């Protein structure tokens, strides 16, 4: 058994050479991904990268153009959504406004013609797990955003789904509520033990919640890894630009700062630019922007723009000259391959 086959055998969900899209238009081609049981995996990418199309193909809402979707080793590629045993939590939770929380959670069970006793038992079980047993008589309008989120997750779990798909459920929330909801979803996932596939365009969502992040760009995987790996060891220039905030160094400036010629592209994160360095490069301070926990300093170095992130109140004055250096080993260099 080769490495890929072993990974698929050990995974609760596998995408094998999956082609995703619409008739006449392939959005994602030849996607391979293995998701471990109980993992929290984010599909991260800009608009149009194909992440939501992948999620809908896993759910069966969008037919696969090629390849296979395997759930616990079983090929579910051709199965309709209701037979896939995966739950989905939509962007706006998609709760029925005229139904109580109990009725929302029970809906799929009643469609499946489960007995009244079984409906009450299973709804009661997932409601207790999700911490909403005391909310079951309420309608969505009378519940907080966090309570609605729990109802949506309970509804997705009540049919026995072990894999939950989240289609950008935080995208319409303000920053403070969004941060609270991130913690809530991650807590529920950890406590209930389900496998989560979470689609987002927001890197903060992915970095704070995920065991594994799959970065998509123009229908292809740029890199797969945990947040720390993506941030500190980016595999491509796109990752440098998309994850965190980086300076792209012009070749002459890269040569001056790194001490060797760069035939390609090089990047330096704002926090890795050091001011006040011994034997550094002279830099002019153009602008200082206070951002609360840190400040951004825009610099000009030998005609090239560069930005630094500083923490604390000791900030240079605009128009002054500072000595600039870089954190050793912090630059990300992608040399051109010649051949």
Swiss-Prot record:
Pfam families in UniProt: ABC_tran (PF00005), TOBE_2 (PF08402)
* Entry keyword set: ATP-binding, Cell inner membrane, Cell membrane, Membrane, Nucleotide-binding, Plasmid, Transport
**Predominant location of this chain?**
membrane
- Tell me the InterPro entries matching this sequence: AAA+_ATPase (IPR003593), ABC_transporter-like_ATP-bd (IPR003439), ABC_transporter-like_CS (IPR017871), ABC_transpr_FbpC (IPR015853), ABC_transpr_MalK/UgpC-like (IPR047641), Mo/tungstate-bd_C_term_dom (IPR008995), P-loop_NTPase (IPR027417), Transp-assoc_OB_typ2 (IPR013611)
Q: Which residues cross the membrane?
A: none
GO MF term set: ABC-type ferric iron transporter activity; ATP binding; ATP hydrolysis activity
User: Which superkingdom heads the taxonomic lineage of this protein's source?
Assistant: Bacteria
The name this protein carries in UniProt is Uncharacterized ABC transporter ATP-binding protein y4fO
